[in-house]
Amino acid sequence: MAPRILLARHGQTEWSLSGKHTGRTDVPLLEEGRVGAKLLGERLHRAPFDGLPDAEVRTSPLARARETCEIAGFGDRATTWDTLMEWDYGSYEGMTPADIQGVRPGWFIWRDGVPRGETLEQITARADEVVAWARSADRDVLVFAHGHILRSIGARWLGLGVDFAARVRLNPTSISTLGWAYGEPAIESWNDTGHLA
């Protein structure tokens, strides 16, 4: 069977709750985020996942992703990987979309990018690196990371431009599975938060 990639978004933080662009700022999880990470871990240790005993696990080195990985019960198996870090928002770090549009009307990150941060081409290259790694694996892979990079990985898995990521939501402590259908890359599940209900 061809390998799949499971995408786990980190738990809720103060900045994600308020809508601030949180790239490289190392903010911790809120208590709500820790609870969500625990529930995510319980979900991943039940059928059909059963703890993913054969999966390779990687996590962003940023605290919110690492802590989610650890609380979910995968910390001892995880390798940190800088490629999974969130988009470097440059001058827009810590700002909400409304703040940015106040000074740059019509701004849209997936079209316009960010000043003094990563370009769309750079985020695409990082997403492509993750996709290539996952497809070359001899087993399923599980990654703990961030909203924009995970959405970009989803788009690139399907062979689409990263701007497609603007059309999909990805909630904190959600799990998504990218796999195959009829021999082609497919989304098996997306933004699944059933464990939080």
Over which residues does each language-model region extend?
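Residue-level preference for the first positions of well-ordered beta-strands
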Residues: 5, 138-144
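Active-site signature of alpha/beta-hydrolase-fold catalytic machinery across serine-
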Residues: 71, 152, 156
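GST superfamily/GST-like fold recognition
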Residues: 147-151, 181
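Acidic, low-complexity terminal tails and accessory targeting/binding regions
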Residues: 1-4, 40, 87-98, 155-197
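Short beta-strand scaffold positions
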Residues: 59-60, 125, 144-145
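Active-site-proximal alpha-helix that buttresses catalytic centers in soluble enzyme cores
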Residues: 2-76, 118
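Phosphate-handling substructures
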Residues: 71-128, 179, 186-189
